Amino acid sequence: MVSCGPRKFSTPEDVQEVLELAGPNRPALDSVISHYRDEGNVFKEEAAYFLIGNMKKHGYAVYHLVDSTGEEVDFNVLSYPDYEALLDGWDELENRRGGLRFEVDTFYHDYHIVTAKYMIENIDLAYEAWNRFKWAGHLDFEEFCEYVLPYRSSNEPVESWRRYFYDKLSWVADSVKDPSDPTEAAIWVNNYIKSWFRFDPRYYEHPTDQGLSEMLDKKLGRCEDMTNLAIYAMRALAIPVMSDFTPYWANTGNNHAWNAILDRNDSVVIFMGGEANPGEYQLGHKLAKVYRKTFSIQENSLPEKLEPWEKAPPYLNSNTIRDVTADYVDAVRVKVDLNKGIPDSVNFAYLCVFNSGEWKAIDYTRFHGEKAYFSQVGPGVAYLHAFYYDEKIVPGGDAFILTDSARVDYLIPDGSNRINIQLYSTTRRITKETTDFSEEASFTPGAIYILYYWRDKWEEAGRAVAGKGPLHFSNVPSGALYWLVQEGSRKEERIFTLNSEGHQVWW
């Protein structure tokens, strides 16, 4: 991370490195530094060093969708009336053209494209807002650099949003009752965003986060777009706002990003841009791991530790995120055994949660011998520790439950002690109770359901056709982690264990 304090020495090495990478665009970046040196403003010069020095890994990609032959496929998320229709349309495309995937067409490094005019305007306006608005008075220079100054929030196209919102929302300063309260200012801004922008799940299939111009045009987006929009509007007024995210929920499918504000007491208060204000927002599912997006390069991030030949799983492959799990849950440290064999040339073990039909990595550690220690993880979750080899998750041990008391309970199928079980649901959310408090089955009559148990992979334990009552399975290995899936589903069903009474316990 490039220092964000008073500088007494020559141009930092990381800045020099980026200037060399900039190639033909180096004169633009050099002129930003020269501009503030000539102006004699040490703080703005330091701000320029912060942005340029941390620019190395920032940029955005333009994608295109291709089929199994590599031929480009025309696809627009807004061509479908709703998310279910989009998923059906995607399935229909894959049936006709084979597997679909987004491929990078062009990647634009920030150090190749940002102009001196853009950088200077961004720094000047950020600095002006920091000094103008009383609600930013509690920020030190390092907090200003991280939570106000950056010209981008994630991997979206670079656009001039700061001037737009600085002018558009100038009325907020006259509307707040307490001009020293950044949270009140954030509420005014968020109410403005809520008046015209909406969440739309179709944007789950949009290949990138949107830039401001696209959001102003469509007025729709996914959670990452909503957090970015709030960051644009609020940072333009020097309201210190950030984006936190969980790579994958621990007890349901998908992931999530949301906003947080650094209030005047230096406490972090969460909210959802365009949806729920600070003090009103609650996360809807279980957290195993939480990270905060940063502009500054995090030296302890996974990409900074990997050897050149090593790959990182999705979401952990960023060096501009930092772990803030302990801010959200009573995080614990867990030790696990690596007893499934260790692939060659692998230096890290990963902790995975089960999400949308797959084990997905949410944390990492450098292992020692046949032991691995993961720090700061959420309890009350089913985990699998694994390796990332050939860009695939490879089990490193048995799945386990990390209990609320931080005990590790391994889930090892016992084929010598087989049981008969009856099941009422594929997920916790659709389990019903009748008026006499007896459990009611919730299946699609006539549909085939497959019961799996985990033993280094999902092994089939039996099939059943749904009627009106529960599903019955016999001769099932006991003590395992189970997964009941409707044939042909999108694999959003949840995993479970069985308690001493044979009832499903959901994870």
What do these predicted regions represent?
Residues 175-192, 203-213, 219-313:
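Hydrophobic/aromatic-rich core segments of domains that either
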Residues 5-186, 236, 265, 288-507:
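N-terminal accessory/pre-domain segments preceding catalytic cores
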Residues 1-2:
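Sec-dependent bacterial lipoprotein signal peptides
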Residues 159-164, 197-203:
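A structural motif
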Residues 25, 193-197, 263:
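Sec/Tat-exported extracytoplasmic proteins
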